[in-house]
Amino acid sequence: MRARTDRLRFLVAIVLAASLALVPVGVALASVNLPLHHWAYDAIERLTALGIIDQAMVVAKPYSRKQAAQYVARAIERIRADEIRPDSREILAEPLFERLMAEFRPELTDLGTIVRKRTEPSSTFRYGARLQTEVDAFSVGGGQTVRFRENRGGEYYANGVQNQTDVRGWLEVGDWAAITVQPKFISNLNALSHGPTVGPLTSLNDQYVYLREASLKLTFWNVALEAGRGTQWWGPGYHGSLLLTDHAFPLDMIKLGSEEAFRLPWKLRDLGEWKINSFLAQLEKNRDFSHAKIFGLRLNYLPTAWLEVGLTRLTQFGGHGRGQSFPKAVVDCYKNPPNQTGTQDCNEQSTIDFRARVPQVPYLIPFPGGMQIYGELGSEDKWSQVPIPSRAAYLAGIYIPQLFKGDTQDLRIEYADTDYTRRKTGLVGVWYNNGNYTSGMRQYGFPLGHSMGTDAIDMYIRTTRYLTDQLQLGHSFNYQERARGLPVHERKQEMSVDLTWWVTARTHITLGYTYQRIKTPGQISSITPFVETFAPGVTATNHFVGMSLSKEF
């Protein structure tokens, strides 16, 4: 009991020490978080890349419905004040704003951006829900029965026809509490795994219904305390991020941070906007050290409207038999040199990332809406060298929100590399692995960060285009090599196409097809230590077809 009290005190101290001097940009009110991959994230990022939304922190996710509404409200104010010149961007902006205003109407009404109707009285209790259901037909070739799904919370493609359905309900109480619950049904048990997928230690899922996410968030002044199960994405990447994504099964955790961006007081106010995020999570039971802990800390900084910078650090410690307690173990890890032993030992990762908007420049940046460049540089263990750490990985990308004037096509190109250290030093299996924590920085064998894992490269290209205001067509290409440090490693080529139909502003249907050709496919064969077994001489040809419906209430 005392240990739990110490943990909570330490987390509270991190934010409160800063928050006592913080000046919130606006009144911070309790609000439920938008789930990762909600369509509003893409819409807000696109409008930010176009320069229509400014002063927006969009890298760290999730953020709340109220925060999203504030970004939309700010853009509406700029449009009403004629701060945005009429040009070809409106062909993209108008349908996006229509959907965003329908989605966040209650929040925009509270902000005064939209006039409240007489039939819409303010209420102490605000609630809503989202229904998602998908029907899939998967064919996994090469003698394989499952294939991991990237950024799907520990899920797998599993042979056969199946259904997945979840309902995400939320409730806000006054200005201080927000509750979210999301149970999920899967008709194929093999669509989820709690351990190895091949070999004598195979541990597949045995539940048709499980709790995907659930949380209670309390907000006071500009401090948000949240407890429950959930996912986070810390990094500017679209197809992955080095430290934290939703590739692995959702984490059970306590989160503490600033609910909204803030400015420093007095003369420091002009330095820009800041935001702090932290969490303490518990990993699964059946691993090297049962219920090992992860502490994460992130500082977001927006010095100007066109640039966002972030610093992130993850610390793995504790677990059954380790003799470590929180917060002492984290403090020791922060102050000690690397490669300690005994109760001083820990596993760490850190990154610095940025997102920058580059406006249109004649003959140099010909795109009508400009472009966005972003990147992430990470270190496994301590950042022992400057500027490039000795155990580095990186991610870089460009996003063009509007390729041609008067058109709606966009383009994203993203490259990630966790094989950099092996090529430079010869060290194999550095990222997501650790000599003492032999299960690594993983949950059920899935990396907490990028889905490609260690010693890997990933090239991702995606383009979308609106055929009409209600129909969006998307194409993606992905080339990936995993575990390049092994004599036999995996090579994947993937192509996909998807069509989204917005039936109404709050209902959409998506049809999708994915083709994969994988040479030497890999499967998890052990968690302790982590081992992935690759099938030499095997080429798997996979076909995935699916249809999903999403309805907001």
Pin down the residues of each PLM region.
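Short loop/turn motifs that connect adjacent beta-strands in outer-membrane beta-barrel proteins
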Residues: 57-59, 81-95, 114-127, 171-179, ...
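Surface-exposed loop and membrane-interface regions of Gram-negative outer-membrane beta-barrel proteins
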Residues: 159-161, 179-217, 235-245, 385
